[in-house]
Amino acid sequence: MTLWINGDWITGQGERRRKTNPVSAEILWQGNDANAAQVAEACQAARAAFPRWARQPFTARQAIVQKFAALLEAHKADLTEVIARETGKPRWEAATEVTAMINKIAISIKAYHARTGEQKSELVDGAATLRHRPHGVLAVFGPYNFPGHLPNGHIVSALLAGNTLIFKPSELTPWTGETVIKLWERAGLPAGVLNLVQGGRETGQALSSLDDLDGLLFTGSASTGYQLHRQLSGQPEKILALEMGGNNPLIIEDVANIDAAVHLTLQSAFITAGQRCTCARRLLVKQGAQGDAFLARLVDVAGRLQPGRWDDDPQSFIGGLISAQAAQHVMEAWRQREALGGRTLLASRKVKEGTSLLTPGIIELTGVADVPDEEVFGPLLNVWRYAHFDEAIRLANNTRFGLSCGLVSTDRAQFEQLLLEARAGIVNWNKPLTGAASTAPFGGVGASGNHRPSAWYAADYCAWPMASLESPELTLPATLSPGLDFSRREAV
């Protein structure tokens, strides 16, 4: 029984599915997808639970969320292992994901009060009050790269605001989704407030097409995001928040500390085996001897990265990709770029055929035409050389995406110029592209998304503002508008 609907664990009636470890092929989870009728049942349960949940005092909702945080802390080791085994991440990185989930609780509570909550301004004859109300029933679509942390940011914020939810994890990480929901169950959520439906494309389409849905919060690929946008077009009454991918540039100017720049680049491009939406996909390196030395050192150090199993000791910097098919897609993208005229600086290599273990690849594409503007979700870094900083900014903006952008430079003036001219939601200076603060908004422009539904601004998309002018007494104004006559006529 792998679906949780209206407080009950039930068996899916859709397609049979199983999840294996992407390196060892060990079977981790088996179950059936939710069919369309079960998706509709989950929505009905959420709708029925909404009025009572929304009317709960905020402190009551907060208490359940904080109980969930305590359960995350108590089961940190177990959840770390689930995430690591299911995604192929090294244990150390999965542990940081669970820590981020725990920390997000306190941040989300602060964000609720700062971004939404209630504010009152006293007037001469009353008060002006701003309140926020939940949308109603929201769907949350989770990604596979951070199957615990990223959906958690939506779910916690939405529940605090008083919404009820249907959560569909990625079909590639059903085990993590189920494990997290069982902790919510133990935290004491009332039946129907949060519902779990497992499945792939058909389940997702059934969920996003429900008439009784008030909104959808999505994190994932641009292709799926665009499909959801088309599906919900003509429905302005529904909130649709899309956090999608990026084809992110990292600019390397003249640097004094080459090893520090190489370390920053490795953290930007290859952490999580390149499976972060903010990962550097395009490396823009200034022409000249220093740029040559930087690239040579990057190739040297990146060539020593050996992806390993989730439980290797000593631990590896990167693990496997989410699946062997994902690794094959990265290999095909590398070969495509070679066929276009790219010059391989570091060849990607499958560590073992049939697994998702893939070494990093680096390919130079300076002067190559018709390079696809796409997000290759894996450890493949494309290099362009440039002559001057204005050209670097032009190259950086030469994409339909706009998620993250970074600069390695000692020149503050260059960073100031980049801040003015970069088309990206996150712009970092001498910091990895993959570094982001949960106390700041997270998201991008263009094909990278339409809002900031993650991190600090998540609260904004989980409630709508209600403005009120109010007075405990009704009185006639001392001064009337022109043309109004309230004088009493003498009776004839």
Swiss-Prot record:
InterPro entries: Ald_DH/histidinol_DH, Ald_DH_C, Ald_DH_CS_CYS, Ald_DH_CS_GLU, Ald_DH_N, Aldehyde_DH_dom, SuccinylGlu_semiald_DH_AstD. PROSITE patterns: ALDEHYDE_DEHYDR_CYS, ALDEHYDE_DEHYDR_GLU. The keyword NAD applies. Coiled coil: none annotated. Its EC number is 1.2.1.71. GO terms for biological process: arginine catabolic process to glutamate; arginine catabolic process to succinate. It catalyses: N-succinyl-L-glutamate 5-semialdehyde + NAD(+) + H2O = N-succinyl-L-glutamate + NADH + 2 H(+). The active site is at E243, C277. NAD(+) binds at G220, S221, A222, S223, T224, G225. Keywords: Arginine metabolism, NAD, Oxidoreductase. The keyword Oxidoreductase applies. It comes from the Bacteria. It is an enzyme of class 1 (oxidoreductase). Gene3D superfamilies: Aldehyde Dehydrogenase, Chain A, domain 1, Aldehyde Dehydrogenase, Chain A, domain 2. It holds the Pfam family Aldedh. Pathway: Amino-acid degradation; L-arginine degradation via AST pathway; L-glutamate and succinate from L-arginine: step 4/5. One of its GO terms (molecular function) is succinylglutamate-semialdehyde dehydrogenase activity. Catalyzes the NAD-dependent reduction of succinylglutamate semialdehyde into succinylglutamate. NCBIfam families: arg_catab_astD, PRK09457.1. Belongs to the aldehyde dehydrogenase family. AstD subfamily. This is N-succinylglutamate 5-semialdehyde dehydrogenase. It comes from Salmonella paratyphi A (strain ATCC 9150 / SARB42). The lineage of its organism: Bacteria, Pseudomonadati, Pseudomonadota, Gammaproteobacteria, Enterobacterales. The gene is astD.
